[in-house]
Amino acid sequence: MSDEEDIDESFEIEEDGISITDARGNSLKAQQIAGKERNLDPEADDLEVVVNFYEAGDGTFQLQLPKLTAVKPVDKVNDVLDFINFDKKVCDGIHSSIKLVSQRDQTGPAPFPKHKLTCAHCDWSFDNVMKLVRHRGVHKNVGVYMCQVCLTLFGHTYNLFMHWRTSCSQTSTTATDIEIQKAETPYLHRNVLNVLGSLNRASQYYCTGGYVFLPSDWCITNKEIVMEKDHMSSCHLCHLPVPNKFLEAHGNVHRGRFRIDGRIYGDYFCHICGTVFIEQDNLFKHWRLHCEEVIAYTPVDQYLSNTELATLAWLVLQTTISQADIECLRVSSSLITEKLAKEHAERHGIANSMHKYYHFPQEIWPLKTFVNLDLVNDAIPISGENSFKIKDPKRPVHIMNLLATACPGFYATGKTFNMICSTKKSESDTKKVYRVILRYTTEGSVIQSYDFTARSFPKLRVDSETPEGVFSHPLADFNVESNEAIVCHKCDSKKLTITFSTEVRLKYHLLRHSESRKDGYHCAICKIIVYNRSHEEHWINDCIPLQKLYRDQKDRECFDAEFAAKCASIIKKLRIRTLIRWKERANEDWVETKQTPDRIGEDFAIKFQVGTTALKTLMAGLEEHYKNAQARHEAYKYSEENFLPPLSTPVVVCFHCGTRCHYTLLHDHLDYCHYWPRNKRLVNEEFHKWKKNGCRNTWRVMKSVAEAMQIEVPFISEEQYSKILDYHTYFCNDTRYKVQDSINNWNDCSTIRDVDLSEKLSVAEIVQKGEDSVMAPEPDIIKNVYFPSARIITDNMLLRMTEINLNDVVQRDPITKEELTGKFKEVQDEQDAILFGDYRAVLRSKGIMVNSISDFVAPPDELAKAKASQESAGQESVDHRNRREREFIQQYMGKDLALEAAARENGRLVEVDEEAEDYELTPKELNARRLVERNRHREMCKTRCEHGEYDYEKFKARQVPINPAKMKERKYLTRVVHESGPDDDVCPDEPENNIIAFSPKYENSLSDFRISAIGFREKYLADDKKKRNGIPIRKMTEAQKGVALDYDTLMARHGGRPDVIMNPAGTVFVGGFVFDRKPTCQDNMQTVYVLRNGYAHRYRIYHCEDTNGIYKFVWPQEQSFDPDSLAKSARVRMVKQVKSPEHMIHHIEEIDESIGHNYRLNRKRRNSETREHELIELDTDDLNEPSTSDGRYSFGHHGYR
């Protein structure tokens, strides 16, 4: 019904003499309520409104209420309510009992039988560590429960109840033993009160229920009070278990009528996690250091004052209220009234229909009421006796529901009402109207006392109405919390429903629940039992040996489980003793034993007994492990500090609900509170699929909702939101936080390697003799350096052998045309897949119509056509070439076969296409041709097996003809050169010498790489089986440590044995590591050391001639590879060191001239003669091998590419 609808004219009530105005405020007359005169123009902080109830003609009940104008909250309010001086309300007999307690011996005789764990301070014994640790609180006097009958103290209520059942002389004799042992706790309380009544002491202790909690001085200043579950109820708004005496104040904190840091009955209560403190400073310290929810919303870059922290805590408390409960909160429902109303509804059997109406108006209990009715069990009758009671199933409406509907919202007007006055119903009233006066006031509001600033970020929420077509789910699913509470069944031993509003709260609760029941463990270094604390905290703060080794606490911040295990292992090998002496046992000396559970709580001293030599050895052995621990710690800090831009704040605001949190926790907040629908069953596959997508479209959806509903929400930028999700994905995929899978073989898990060419490819075209050769500008190949392009390798980019989909073609060697088998074919297929991709899809889209590298080699028919077009070159050069080739054939196949082959084409030997229709080779002729090609290739590759300086001229002899039809594809390969072989004693004008050969860069990236990688893996596996001991790690020099690689780290980082690669610039690529040269390191870069099982195995590195030591670079090989956290590329470093491009080119020339042309090609299996020149492990006698005199390092072939 409209608020502006007219009601009856003004009338008078004879008994009270109260004059009531109409709804419009017309004809206001002076009123007097309970002898108090009211002004015609009430002040803003005090207002009385008349509520009219009447029954309409159709039998429904209606209510009229005039509108209230919005009132601004007062500037200063008093936040001290009637929650103080609780101790004055307790009987004076408690204080007299405390005096008597100090004269009693509280430990008592030890129980029988004797258990294995004995207390260090008394004769009590226990059968497990948890009971012993709990018993220690008795000696500390942390706070005890006193029996009011015999004044005996107990540490826990359970022990007090057992005392009442068994040993209390007064209570145990009031009934039989069986009755007392089976009695419930309420019966025990009543039994104690009866005993106290018989002793004329019942009136003194009735308010405490038979026992008193006595906190000690230490407990008052340092410890929070733990409340028993028997005296707690769950808040219906945030579902927090709240002690009954704090329940009403907790509800007022929700409604903004009591400060969250206010004092309640002498205590300070954390309304977020339910912890009680004696001092306010401890409450603020708790919010800063221990309360998980407040810490999650606290900025890490700012220090909040106590006022700001209290504001932030209150806002965090408000985020625990669901959207539906906010509507109820606007009428400031009473928690105690809710509890009683639920019990009332259960008694009348209508508990399932309570959701149909508002249950609890604001401040009904314990406000002053002048209605003279029980607002809980009875109802105000309207138009008939008991016609408005809640137990009537046909009219499930209570008077409090109408009051709740009538009361204006506190957040809308700034007012609440604090008094209900009723007028007596007149018998002459025929319209069946009943009137109630509600007295509104702003007294008690503390909203303005909070410090709402940008630092405290008030929480904003979207409205409950959802625009059509935006969401497929109700907006309630995207709210902060679900409307239904989550029940914890683990701690509900007494069937007390402990509920939580969010999964995050339940998670923290279960974590604390499990930790409180976790047994102690021994520290492997100091042998002391560490109870209920993390390993890292103990190693950093309390471990005595580590404090002696690393005195500065900052040096111990990087300690982790891996470092502690290494430290304990080295201490054990060196036989360093850690001795313990128990101060309270004078007859015992220093002993080398672990602390036993029976000595928990005893004072002790630790002696770390180590000699000077052993100490130096220990520190030397820990040096490498300490550096690794520091590197792991710094890498973790670097990834957190440098992921977001430096100017951006790490604190972000959730665009759904306005929640303020650290950016690393935003994704978890979205997980638990917004994205995944609560009413949908959680399926692992769907959940991981959803999480993999990152929900990046949610930002746009929520922004459209805010714009459509005109809500001012502090949105973060879309770019920053994407960065946060990227960081969360990187953080979750970090290999340091995952268990490594089984190690795969090198060929089973390929890695994509991008080659970024600095210049485009230029080639020389083949022209006929007598014409000018047209050549593109071709600089010396030695000046060109390629740099691997670092990028993140994801699962989608990795190519495995099982996923490569190429045509089933026979893979042949590009030069000899021999069919490749075994591992060489696998490497060829893999490199083809990496270079050309899937032939059916990727190749056509990129314009590369090839299947493998072999397609770039000219087939015999194309070569024959090219040669036939050049017959005018001259008979003299033809005779010369034919004479050379006949000598080759005669050397291996005999003179007759050579002459016969020469006579086939008018005295000219040519290569014949096997598929040509006009000519067919006999088997002998075919074998002769193949043998000639095989022998020619063998002659060209002989230089790979030789030691010493590399002869660039010999490399030019390896001439590879390029298929003219594939010339347009050359830009996807690498640089090629146009040269003649040095061993060709031919005429300079002969056109046959103008053939194109593959460049050293091409051969290095595609040929030598696969051969050296396979060779490295075979040799490494072979050396692994020998298990030969190398150099002890502690005997390694600084230079040797500079080129050392830990074997376990290699396995953990890469999931398998890595390959070792070297590029033409001398950069060593070792398994995806940045191999930087240190300024203090005098390493000659001839070797690399692999650390395993305490020894360093030395391996020789070939073709590593970076004499200037300018740069080293990484070849990305990890899935979670982060290019920002690695060193800059070689190109960037080089540009920073030179002033101009000309200087840079000159600088590169100087580097490359010192390197030499150390490029080889070997696609065949190496025979037994060359196997000894592969990657070899050196003995310890070869450690002092001097470098070459000119400072350059020339080795054999098969360098690490």
From Swiss-Prot:
A zinc finger (C2H2-type) spans 117-139, 145-168, 233-254, 268-290, 486-513, 521-543, 652-674. GO terms for molecular function: DNA-binding transcription factor activity, RNA polymerase II-specific; sequence-specific DNA binding; zinc ion binding. Disruption phenotype: In the TOR complex 2 mutant background rict-1, RNAi-mediated knockdown suppresses the growth delay and elevated body fat index. One of its GO terms (cellular component) is nucleus. Its main location: nucleus. SMART domains: ZnF_C2H2 (SM00355). InterPro entries: Znf_C2H2_sf (IPR036236), Znf_C2H2_type (IPR013087). It is found in: Nucleus; Chromosome. One of its GO terms (biological process) is sex determination. Residues 1167-1176 have a biased composition (Basic and acidic residues). Component of the SDC complex, which consists of sdc-1, sdc-2 and sdc-3. Within the complex, interacts with sdc-2 and sdc-3. Embryonic transcription factor regulating downstream genes involved specifically in the sex determination and dosage compensation pathways, or regulating other genes involved in the coordinate control of both processes. Component of the SDC complex that functions in sex determination and in X chromosome dosage compensation specifically in hermaphrodite (XX) animals. Involved in the recruitment of the condensin I-like dosage compensation complex to the male sex-determining autosomal gene her-1, thereby contributing to its repression and initiating hermaphrodite sexual development. This is Zinc finger protein sdc-1. The gene is sdc-1.
